[in-house]
UniProtKB/Swiss-Prot annotation:
It comes from Methanocaldococcus jannaschii (strain ATCC 43067 / DSM 2661 / JAL-1 / JCM 10045 / NBRC 100440). InterPro entries: Sulfopyruvate_deCO2ase_bsu (IPR022494), THDP-binding (IPR029061), TPP_dependent_decarboxylase (IPR051818), TPP_enzyme_TPP-bd (IPR011766). Its EC number is 4.1.1.79. The gene is comE. Heterododecamer composed of 6 subunits alpha and 6 subunits beta. Binds 1 thiamine pyrophosphate per subunit. Pathway: Cofactor biosynthesis; coenzyme M biosynthesis; sulfoacetaldehyde from phosphoenolpyruvate and sulfite: step 4/4. GO terms for biological process: coenzyme M biosynthetic process. This is Sulfopyruvate decarboxylase subunit beta.
Length: 188
């Protein structure tokens, strides 16, 4: 059985240091990241579905720190062009973790096409990206640790069950989060 998204997020947080930047996609995944561990170097995407991968790319191209993006299959499907751009730019400090639960988790778990005929690994590989799909928590952690220690762009597609952890809303106002994040990455 596939793991839950929150368990993947916990493994990400357990394995990053203080220097890594984490960008999380819209809605519940951002709330889950905040619930697991709020950090100044977390960027919580609160308003634009499909743009976390592009925001992470911009950060990776403009800083030396490792940038980890937590995105969903639904968000990636809304912005497939981001994979092509990431593959073209190919930043060595970029890890894209696609949580593939075959559902639009933040809007009620409506099914996405990845549960049928859309293969995100093949799409990402077609864009020139080093990509692997994991189906267990142990396999994900192994691949994520490897990616953290490599100097190359990596996409990890983590198959998960469609499940939303019950988490409260992020209590810090978005404008405060923005400035806190900007100050944190300026110091690196």
């Amino acid at each position: 059985m596939y793991p839950k998204r929150i368990d993947i997020i916990k493994k990400i947080v357990e394995n990053v240091g203080e220097k890594e930047i984490i960008v999380s996609n819209i809605g519940i995944p951002s709330k889950e990241l905040y619930y697991v561990k709020d950090r100044e170097r977390n960027f919580y995407m609160l308003g634009s579905m499909g743009l976390a991968s592009s925001i992470g790319l911009g950060l990776a191209l403009n800083c030396e720190d490792k940038v980890i993006v937590i995105d969903g299959d639904g968000s990636i499907l809304m912005n497939l062009g981001s994979l092509s751009t990431i593959g073209y730019m190919n930043p060595k400090n970029y890890i894209l973790v696609i949580i593939d639960n075959s559902a639009y988790g933040s809007t009620g778990n409506q099914k996405t096409h990845t549960g049928k005929n859309t293969n995100l690994e093949e799409i990402a590989k077609g864009c020139g990206l080093d990509t692997i799909t994991t189906e267990s928590l142990e396999e994900f952690e192994k691949e994520f640790k490897n990616a953290l220690n490599e100097e190359k762009c990596k996409v990890i597609i983590a198959k998960t069950i469609p499940y939303n952890e019950k988490c409260s809303n992020i209590e810090i106002p978005p404008v405060v989060l923005k400035y806190r994040f900007m100050e944190a990455i300026k110091r690196s």
